[in-house]
Amino acid sequence: SQDLLTGDLRLGVIPTIGPFMLPTLLKELRDSYPKLGLYLKEDMSAKLYRHLQQGELDLIVLAFPYSLPEMDTVSLFKDEFLLCLSPGHKLESSKKIRQSQLRGQSLLLLEEGHCLRDHALEACKLEKADTNLVYQGTSLHTLVHMVANGLGVTLLPQIAVTAEVLGDTKLQLKKFTKENVSREIGLAWRKSDPRRDEYLLLADFIRQNVLNRQSD
């Protein structure tokens, strides 16, 4: 497979994946495929999809479900949601969280346009009316700081937790009682693109990289 993954590759990644997956992935990709030249763009799903349609990107990493007509997609991994809360919060004593316990909580989420926001609400079976949306942030790091200051709770994807988004805060993480409170991360490219085999190879590489980090 050494003749695959050579030349230039333009990869788009959404902001709730890029900062947490790319740093270690890029180093290992460079070591394994030194002839691969990567150009990276981080943006919201809708913009990345447009760049992909227009041929400005070769493939994109994003979260499903997301409507992608004319594109081939492959699933990479499930990214579990965890509830993040500050010490002393009334949900702290719960070993695991039932989705119904989120109703009426002060919930901190990303602003409109970030698909993580919709995926988190959907995965937790929450309507906007069920929650008290007290703050809309621009990044997961911002949300973590707001929780640390006692302003509410938030939902964090496992990939961000593995990449130590909590830093040196004393925040608590709780799993949900229900299985599959998660989003699905995948790759997408144009159906007409002849490099399908390379993209499937890259998908395997990313999958392995993420699994290795989560088992560390």
Predicted features along the sequence, with ranges:
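Short loop->beta-strand "edge-of-pocket" segments that line small-molecule binding or catalytic clefts
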Residues: 12, 81, 90, 97-117, ...
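Secondary-structure junction motif
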Residues: 92, 106-127, 195-203, 213
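Hydrophobic hinge/microswitch elements
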Residues: 44-49, 53-57, 62-63, 113-171
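A late-sequence structural motif
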Residues: 21, 172-214
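Alpha-helical linker/hinge and terminal dimerization helices associated
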Residues: 1-2, 202
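Beta-alpha-beta core module
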Residues: 68-75, 79, 94-95, 141-191
